[in-house]
Amino acid sequence: MKSDYDTTSEEAGPSQQEIGRWPLALFILHRCLAPYFARPEPYQRVLLYLQAVLSEIPRKNGWQIAEHAKQARPYGMQRLLSRAIWDDEGVRNEMRAFILQTLSHPSPVPLGAPSGTKPRIPFPVIVIDESGFPKRGTHSAGVKVQYCGATGQGENCQVGVFLTYVTDLGHALIDCALYVPADWCTDAARRQSAHLPETVRFQTKPELAQHLVQRALSASLPIRWVVADTVYGHNTDLRLWLEEQGFSSALAVPANEVVCVETAQGYRICEVASIERQRPGATLDWQRLSMSQGTKGERLFDWAIVPHVHRGIVDGCHFVVIRRCLDDPREIAYYLVVTAPGTSLHTIVLAIGARWWIEVDLENAKDLGLDHYEVRSYTRTLL
């Protein structure tokens, strides 16, 4: 979900030089996908489909994709995305491997900078976020009136949970899952009409996010940090699971999230919004730091870090990080952070700043037709 102060724009999209390299990369990728297609027709058609979505046609729907591919009717493209037999999970896994190869160094990038040098983002970072896709009808899998991040209000829409993978070489969406509301999961007729597999049960968005991160972990993706907004940070189970996997994490939480911190009266349980009032001397050590470079310049905020009690002790690994807007000091965000002892606040801030790359990736994906899809069934909805 995009913040009011986010500065991503068309300038954050791919450059003409990058676009010029797409055809060769596309042919290489297409060759990698061959084992996942049982017949030559859909395998050849998927190349035409990918060429169309990378083109500048105004809408990436069945008719316009077919016209770009010099096909008289859209039925072949529609069949490719709905009923044609091919291994969509295998294609997803191959795409993820292709992205990992593209965004990886031959040797690991050091976690921290040498003493006295400028901190840098602790790559690789996994970013979790969701996106909504407004719909007019009621038959697409999982559609209902619910919060839609694309419009900032309740809409008849589908919602997907997404992962972006960020390294110093670039960033890309690597996985997604369709959120299926509980009332859909218990409606046998709707399940049948949308081809929901029997294995699909209701999962909250944080549960879907955990499943996606587990899938990335099972695919041996190197991961150092996981960052996400309050939808995911407010979920205790997800936070604990990420810590159990050994990841550093910086997850936004609402102002009423409860922690135990040192106060003037000793250790007390309080809401994160009241930490400054509770602190001895009622002061925090604020530092003005940039979380990333935006299209309008450095994204500067004031930041403070406070250790909090975890399992009865202050262990030097668990913190509340507070971000205050320069233009309006009343605009404050809170993060629960788990990281290695000695990690600098600036490094944590840079990890948090990596979250905005998923906004860029979702914008670029929608430019390529992510929100133009016409598939109603569950299996290939977010292709």
Regions found by a protein language model. Name each.
Residues 2-5, 9-226, 231-248, 255-258, ...:
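Conserved, well-structured functional cores that handle cations and Mg-NTP chemistry
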Residues 22-33, 46-50, 77, 81, ...:
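Generic structural signal of hydrophobic/aromatic residues within well-ordered alpha-helices
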Residues 169-194, 198, 250-358:
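An anionic, glycine-rich sequence signature occurring as long contiguous blocks
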